[in-house]
A protein has these predicted regions:
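Non-heme Fe(II) oxygenase metal-center motifs and adjacent flexible, charged/small-residue loops
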Residues: 1-128
Length: 128
């Protein structure tokens, strides 16, 4: 499979066929049933317009104290496991033995906005 390289990103056009896309979508819906979407609070007050969830050991969370990775959904339960179809994509595209620790899920409705940004306090910029 040949990737299209654009501004440092590898684009794998047609990597997932229709059936595989539907499997991923159903897997994500299963995660969201267990860990419903929430709108994070920002440090200056107010809430983000994007709705979020996660799977894996950690999920992204933000409140007035700032943002961070946490081991539990805001409702108190651990994040669900990363679904097998998503782990399979990781395996196929990375070829790494290292396993992903989290899978962030963002839902943007028609009114949601998130500007281009980089989280500058990440421990390792080599990993997605």
């Amino acid at each position: 499979m040949t990737a299209l390289r654009l501004r440092g990103f590898d684009i794998h056009k047609e990597f997932l066929g229709r059936v595989a896309q539907q499997e991923v979508l159903e897997a994500v819906r299963g995660v969201v049933r267990q860990a419903p979407f929430f709108r994070p609070e920002v440090p200056r007050g107010g809430r983000m317009s994007v709705r979020m969830s996660a799977a894996g050991r950690y999920g992204w969370f933000s409140d007035r104290r700032g943002y961070r990775y946490v081991t539990e959904h805001p409702e108190g339960q651990p994040w669900p496991e990363i679904p097998a179809p998503i782990v399979a994509i990781w395996d196929q595209l990375t070829g790494l033995e290292r396993r992903p620790e989290c899978c962030l899920i963002n839902y943007y409705d028609a009114d949601a906005r998130m500007g281009l940004h980089q989280d500058r306090d990440e421990a390792d910029f080599q990993w997605p």
